[in-house]
């Protein structure tokens, strides 16, 4: 991929390893800053990290997380990044309405999903990422669950498994 004249769709469908080196380097610096910030703010840790960071070469994984706040996205994304895994988060397409957010999410390898529909474009992009050996992050509830008493409903994501 070239550095300029790329659309977000080019990044949604391209292997992370083919992203321009400047983009990958920028992502690494931003991840470092976010890792330090999130560790200082929330003092999180990954339990059973060896299970999460263990991977089979050439085979992608679907990482499924509960979504209780926006903070866990930082924790999960940075922990996996510094554990040697390049994760492709699936994000709601409403975020892509902002050009800056759309640009940023596409450069970290995010894949937009049109919620409430059978978004085959998203599923195909995630499927191709998995076939290339990349990892996909999904929050299957489709939204944040504010209370631990409420049992989360699973709206999507299991088509990838």
For each predicted feature, which ranges?
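A transmembrane-helix-recognition feature enriched in membrane-embedded lipid enzymes
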Residues: 2-50, 99-108
């Amino acid at each position: 991929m070239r550095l300029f004249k790329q659309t977000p769709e080019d990044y949604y469908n391209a292997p992370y390893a083919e992203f321009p080196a400047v983009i990958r380097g920028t992502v690494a610096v931003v991840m470092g800053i976010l890792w330090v910030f999130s560790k200082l703010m929330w003092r999180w840790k990954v339990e059973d990290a060896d299970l999460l960071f263990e991977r089979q070469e050439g085979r992608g994984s679907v990482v499924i997380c509960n979504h209780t706040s926006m903070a866990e996205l930082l924790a999960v994304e940075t922990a996996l990044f510094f554990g040697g895994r390049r994760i492709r988060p699936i994000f709601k397409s409403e975020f892509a309405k902002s050009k800056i957010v759309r640009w940023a999410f596409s450069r970290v390898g995010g894949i937009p999903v049109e919620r409430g529909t059978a978004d085959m474009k998203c599923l195909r992009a995630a499927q191709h990422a998995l076939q290339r050996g990349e990892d996909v992050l999904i929050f299957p509830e489709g939204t944040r669950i504010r209370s631990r008493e409420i049992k989360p409903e699973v709206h999507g994501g299991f088509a990838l498994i």
